[in-house]
Amino acid sequence: MKFLFAFNFFSLYIYLYEFLCIHLCGSQVTPAGTVLNSNSALISRRINRRKMKNCNNNDLLKVLKMETTYNELPAHNLLMSSKNDINKLFDYINKNEELSKLMNSCGTYVYLKYLGVVIFSIKENVQISHLSEFIQYLLNKNVCIEFNQNVML
């Protein structure tokens, strides 16, 4: 019953939002459907990653073996998820001085709370040896990592 009420309330909220914004603000409003579709794609990708035992790809192996450069990477953003709480892992990395320096030399991250994923943006002047070491640490902590061209910080 609570779920049905919450769903109906959410639907009512969306209809009111569409009416007020589109009719009063004009047509310069981005429709909510595209945002929901991109979030659902991230959610389904996260679920797929958690089900897979080996969720890492050949591009990561090239980074680990230091056989690539920044310009040869398929994307400059990494989508990360884990069966464990990935937010706690990144909190630990931030508190550890050595790991924090390593992570900051590689790039920056944003934790998406409701999706339970991290989007990591690789710095343009990253040393592949540092990136390799950071990725190896994450893989040892059972983090699924994917190069993703569709997400940006």
UniProtKB/Swiss-Prot annotation:
The answer to whether UniProt assigns keyword Protein biosynthesis to this entry is no
**Primary location recorded for the protein, binned into one broad class:** secreted
Any one GO CC term of the record = plasma membrane
A GO BP term here is: negative regulation of endopeptidase activity
**Signal sequence interval, chain numbering:** 1-27
Q: Where is this region: Dispensable for parasite growth in host erythrocytes?
A: 127-153
Q: What does this protein do?
A: Acts as a specific inhibitor of subtilisin-like protease SUB1.
Protein name according to UniProt: Subtilisin propeptide-like protein
